[in-house]
Amino acid sequence: MRAPIKKIFTFDPFKKNEERQIHQVQNLIWGEWTKELKENEEILDPVSGEVFLRVPNTTDFSEYIKNFDKCPKSGLHNPIKNPERYLMLGEVSRNASRILKEKSVEQYFCKLIQRVMPKSKSQCLGEVEVTRVFLENFSGDNVRFLARSFSNPGNYLGQETSGYRWPFGSVCIIAPFNFPLEIPVLQVMGALFMGNRPLVKVDSKVSVVFEQFLRLLIHCGLPASDVDFINCKGEVMGELIKRSKNQIRLLQFTGSKEVAQRLSLETFGKIKIEDAGFDWKIIGPDYDPKWTKHVAWQCDEDAYNASGQKCSAQSFLFVHKNWEKDLLPRLKELASKRKLENLDVGPILTWTNQQIIEHINCLLTIPGSKILFGGKKLLNNTIPPIYGSFQPTALEIPIDKILGDNFKKITKEVFGPFQIIVVYEDKNMQIVKKTLENISQNLTAAVVSNDVLFQQEILASTVNGTTYSGMKARTTGAPQNHWFGPSGDPRSAGIGTPEAIISTWSSHREIIKDVGPL
């Protein structure tokens, strides 16, 4: 690392895994980085299998709970209290985006992400760019514009009603492993912008990324006491939430549907969720050979980038019969070109090979189902056995076997390079729409068609929060310039845009001024 970077960051991702280079991740509590840590979890490099990180296994969280009481429910700031903090956070965003634009810092985070969540350089770079542009968007006055209020005339002289966006106060953020920079940074900044004080827990496998970015934010002027950062096991975090559920005003969770449901009950519904997505794409009847190459490329990108470890990854692909002969061979060819050498396919951090094989074998018991391509382990690698390493895989299931007893196992989300493909015809549209209606997760979707009537039929019948429509439609790659999040659930959390921040991180407050005269 260059000298200026060393002043900010404490871990060098460019150095090889030598004993002296094992990095100790630290917690941040009320502005102080922890110095002495007795219990740690050793994190293996997902590619080489060597230990390269030590992450605190925090078990005593009493101080974190005490800190919840240090932030009132009116927040660190609101439209009436401490408004100068809106300006301060705009300046922090400006400074952070400027530094993140420097090539050396951009490459630092790109490499750091790749070390803990191995994916292609372009995927890592895209995550850094989205984060940087988000910070640019909320530089200067745009933070206070998030808290814009409105007024309506009263019934008589001296009466006026005003609507405000109000913070929750002490909040909690739990972020996953698959986007170790983008997700925690965008949610933490959104929480701060609206006046909240967050406690942040990021998956321990990748938490070093947020640790380093938090150091950058503090370097850029963020008060170190504005955020608490804890590293611990999931069950410990669950116990922390259980013991402080009356003090946590809001929990924002990004992760699996099962954990989201448990936390929803634990917090009495004080939760905003961006849960796992079994995301579908439907390719319409308007086959056009000049579009096949692009449609195939986008399907491959959506299903297998980051080894399918995206909550927006294409899990269920409906292919109209008109496209079948031209499209499916192209998908197989594209998948075969993905190599571990450039991390177009790589370690799977939450599924083992055995779990994937068992799921495939379960699906193959469905009459007529078959593997179209893939279905085997990656060979000749040093990926540790606690992680998966699997070829990009597609399994075809007959359209008439989707509904009924098989539905639950067919729609089980595999957080890896795996998708279900179903070929359908016009006469099957009721089955297709019934399938989409029954899928419980409504994050992303794509309607790949320029047939306006077909678009209307599908869009009118579905609820996915981020839906792309048209021949260039995708399920992944959401930038910072549009809403990303599920729909159809009052607990849905958004990310990236002013609407997402306002919806997720503030509530409506009405103040009626009634001053007379008599």
Give the positions of each predicted feature:
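Conserved C-terminal structural/oligomerization subdomain of aldehyde/semialdehyde dehydrogenase
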Residues: 1, 50-53, 84-94, 202, ...
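N-terminal Rossmann-like NAD(P)+-binding subdomain of aldehyde/semialdehyde dehydrogenases
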Residues: 1-160, 203, 473
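Residue-level signal for inorganic ion chemistry
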Residues: 31, 49, 195, 227, ...
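Short, well-ordered beta-strand elements within core beta-sheets of diverse protein domains
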Residues: 51-58, 74-79, 173, 282-283, ...
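ALDH superfamily catalytic-core signature
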Residues: 95, 99, 219-221, 244-245, ...
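Short alpha-helical
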Residues: 104, 108, 119, 130, ...
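Rossmann-like NAD(P) dinucleotide-binding subdomain of oxidoreductase/dehydrogenase enzymes
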Residues: 114, 145-294, 325
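A polyampholytic, Gly/Pro-enriched intrinsically disordered region
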Residues: 252, 294-299, 488-497
